[in-house]
């Protein structure tokens, strides 16, 4: 059994040692909630890694989007190269849930494009939890959605040992039961092939390695691992576990029991609809459900089988679904990164799902059991927590009220201080800002400007360009790839000024930024709340010469709190630096880490061009093949936005064939 072991040339510095000790002491005392209040650039991820190494427990890290989850996953893989670090996010590249619009009598069928690479990673994550304890899973909030029952998943796992008495056909039968498909030609993940006394299987958790079972009569003579592409034998195995090809795989006994319950629920619901004289809805429900029942009876599953998961799991109506959290052992550790953003997402999930399901059930598209194929309610999520650490530079009220221990990480290993804050009047703010921009550019640095509206961001950018400033703007309409390209170009000096509305998202920690300007700082609201202001101020905390200018005629409560907190931190940091003889150093962050994303963006701009108009059918076919290969490679390298863009282009080309 492996143990967590950090590989890093760094040792905990600054506030990290005391933060690690405080959190560890709290967790070892059995406290359920703790918070790491770490300023931007203080090395919160490294602190988390040290806590994991010390406690040696399976760990779930929750992030608020796929991009941030992928970044964290990469960082933890570097810290723990000998251990298992997995990535668990929604496997949909595109997802349109089934819905019904009564006003227009329009039923929208579920439409989804599943990313095979992410599905593989999800299976890899769940199977790892059954095999080892040194496992870290970085997940998005989609992990609180219903997943198959872990007990059923474990029960259906096929355990094979060398020397075991087992007929080949019996294993084949079990593989089909857990949703593997026989395919002797297109041998891929989740399939098996048979050649005489050889049975080759590609497990659901990998696409590069296969398992070869060699039989001698009814005995397993040999188990070998091989490279799927080359066929080269990698090594011998004494034992292998084949996990189900679907998290919703169910045993025959469960299916038989469940079909009766589905039929009972159907009869009860039909009586209810008929009594309300909803004859069309009753007819629709009977037809749709009977079709699903026949599919389950014949195949063991149907499209949308997750809508019957409550019955398949044997749960009572209204009870919480099984999720990724249920695959963890009871003593697992939970980190919620950027908790001030992630927790509100967890809270909002259930309500959005319920309102859509109401319409489907009311109009006879689904049985009431579909209500229980859902994300967890917030209270249910809380009950599943063993011990949790919230991680944020600006923890919200929930985190602060619930935490029995709060560790502050104010000192940065680089000695950098929180930036100086200057308040200037709104009158003449644009002219003053232009002067400040010129002064900052003359020192070789960059500028971030945050406005309140998209229109203002566009107008200000246009005005700056007219004055000869290399400026651009960024808003929510710009996708992740284009966003990464803009950041990279800002860092390389293609632009000197970046204007935006909400510049708080991950990835905007840019060492070259020496000025952050906040326009209309005294307009109270979401974008000028204490949390938003502190987060925005933090964008200037990567450069030793940086400052923040707030343009305001009045000092609001939010401004006062944000300024006061920044000054408090700055005082602590200054005293620490003087005491230890530390000179603040601007972070030296290579632009290299954005090049892959930039390359993607540069290539994807070609995809948006009208190049398909002049293509012949043969050329279109060739291009489709090239894009398909590239899409699969992009997905494999976790470049999911690029893969999605390529997928859209493939669809467009198919229409031109």
Swiss-Prot record:
This protein's GO cellular component annotations are:
cytoplasm; excinuclease repair complex
Identify the residues that bind ATP: 38-45
Q: Which domain of life is it from?
A: Bacteria
Q: Where is this motif: Beta-hairpin?
A: 91-114
Q: Where is it localised? A: Cytoplasm
Write down the Pfam families for this protein, in alphabetical order: Helicase_C, ResIII, UVR, UvrB, UvrB_inter
- Which Gene3D superfamilies does its entry note? P-loop containing nucleotide triphosphate hydrolases (3.40.50.300), UVR domain (4.10.860.10)
GO biological process assignments: nucleotide-excision repair; SOS response
| Segments forming domain Helicase ATP-binding | 25-182
PROSITE patterns, alphabetized: HELICASE_ATP_BIND_1, HELICASE_CTER, UVR
The chain positions of domain Helicase C-terminal read 429-595
Its function, per the record, reads: The UvrABC repair system catalyzes the recognition and processing of DNA lesions. A damage recognition complex composed of 2 UvrA and 2 UvrB subunits scans DNA for abnormalities. Upon binding of the UvrA(2)B(2) complex to a putative damaged site, the DNA wraps around one UvrB monomer. DNA wrap is dependent on ATP binding by UvrB and probably causes local melting of the DNA helix, facilitating insertion of UvrB beta-hairpin between the DNA strands. Then UvrB probes one DNA strand for the presence of a lesion.
- Which family does the similarity line name? Belongs to the UvrB family.
Q: Quote the subunit structure annotation.
A: Forms a heterotetramer with UvrA during the search for lesions. Interacts with UvrC in an incision complex.
Q: What is known of its domains?
A: The beta-hairpin motif is involved in DNA binding.
Q: What is this protein called?
A: UvrABC system protein B
């Amino acid at each position: 059994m492996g143990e967590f072991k950090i590989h890093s040339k760094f040792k905990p510095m600054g506030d990290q040692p005391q933060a690690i000790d405080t959190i560890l002491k709290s967790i070892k005392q059995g406290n359920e909630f703790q918070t790491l209040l770490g300023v931007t650039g203080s090395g919160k991820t490294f602190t988390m890694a040290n806590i994991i190494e010390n406690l040696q427990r399976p760990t779930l890290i929750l992030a608020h989007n796929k991009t941030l989850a992928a970044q964290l996953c990469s960082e933890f893989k570097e810290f723990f190269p000998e251990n298992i670090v997995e990535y668990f996010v929604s496997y949909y590249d595109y997802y349109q849930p089934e819905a019904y619009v009564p006003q227009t009598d329009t039923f929208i069928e579920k439409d989804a494009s599943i990313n095979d690479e992410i599905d593989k990673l999800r299976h890899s994550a769940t199977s790892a939890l059954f095999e080892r304890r040194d496992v870290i899973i970085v997940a998005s909030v989609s992990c609180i959605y219903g997943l198959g029952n872990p007990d059923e998943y474990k029960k259906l796992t096929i355990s094979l040992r060398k020397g075991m008495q087992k007929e080949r056909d019996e294993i084949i039968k079990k593989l089909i039961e857990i949703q593997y498909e026989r395919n002797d030609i297109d041998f891929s993940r989740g399939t098996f092939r048979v050649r005489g006394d050889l049975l080759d299987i590609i497990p659901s958790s990998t696409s590069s390695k296969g398992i070869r079972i060699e039989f001698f009569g009814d005995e397993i003579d040999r188990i070998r691992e091989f490279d799927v592409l080359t066929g080269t034998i990698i090594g011998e195995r004494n034992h292998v576990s084949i996990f189900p090809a679907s998290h919703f795989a169910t045993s025959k006994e469960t299916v038989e029991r469940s079909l009766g319950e589905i039929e009972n629920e159907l009869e009860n619901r039909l009586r209810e609809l008929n009594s309300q004289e909803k004859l069309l809805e009753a007819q629709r429900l009977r037809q749709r459900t009977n079709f699903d029942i026949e599919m389950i009876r014949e195949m063991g599953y149907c499209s949308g089988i997750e809508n019957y998961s409550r019955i398949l799991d044997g749960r009572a109506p209204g009870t919480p679904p099984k999720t990724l959290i249920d695959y963890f052992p009871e003593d697992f550790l939970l980190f919620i990164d950027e908790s001030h953003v992630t927790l509100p997402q967890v809270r909002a999930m259930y309500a959005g799902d319920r309102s859509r399901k109401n319409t489907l059930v009311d109009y006879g598209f689904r049985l009431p059991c579909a209500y229980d194929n859902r994300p967890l309610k917030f209270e249910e999520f809380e009950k599943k927590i063993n011990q949790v650490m919230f991680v944020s530079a600006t923890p919200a009220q929930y985190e602060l009220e619930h935490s029995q221990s709060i560790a502050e990480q104010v000192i940065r290993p680089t000695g950098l201080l929180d930036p100086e804050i200057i308040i200037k009047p709104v009158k003449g703010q644009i002219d003053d800002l232009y002067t400040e921009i010129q002064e900052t550019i003359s020192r070789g640095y960059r500028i971030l400007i945050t406005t309140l509206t998209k229109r203002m961001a566009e107008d200000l950018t246009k005005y700056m360009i007219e004055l000869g400033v290399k400026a651009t703007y960024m808003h929510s309409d710009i996708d992740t790839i284009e966003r990464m390209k803009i950041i990279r170009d800002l860092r390389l000096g293609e632009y000197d000024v970046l204007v935006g509305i909400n510049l708080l998202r991950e990835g905007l920690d840019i060492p070259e930024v020496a000025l952050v300007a906040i326009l209309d700082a005294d307009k109270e609201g979401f974008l000028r709340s204490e949390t938003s202001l502190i987060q925005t101020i933090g964008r200037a905390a990567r450069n030793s010469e940086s400052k923040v200018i707030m343009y305001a005629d009045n000092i609001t409560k939010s401004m006062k709190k944000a300024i006061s907190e920044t000054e408090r931190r700055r005082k602590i940091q200054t005293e620490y630096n003087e005491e230890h003889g530390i000179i603040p150093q601007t972070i030296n962050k290579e632009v290299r880490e954005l090049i892959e994303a930039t390359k993607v963006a540069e290539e994807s701009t070609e995809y948006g061009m009208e190049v398909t108009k002049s293509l012949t059918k043969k050329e279109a076919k060739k291009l489709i093949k090239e894009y398909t290969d590239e899409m699969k490679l992009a997905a494999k390298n976790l470049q999911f936005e690029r893969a999605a863009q390529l997928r859209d282009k493939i669809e467009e080309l198919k229409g031109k064939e």
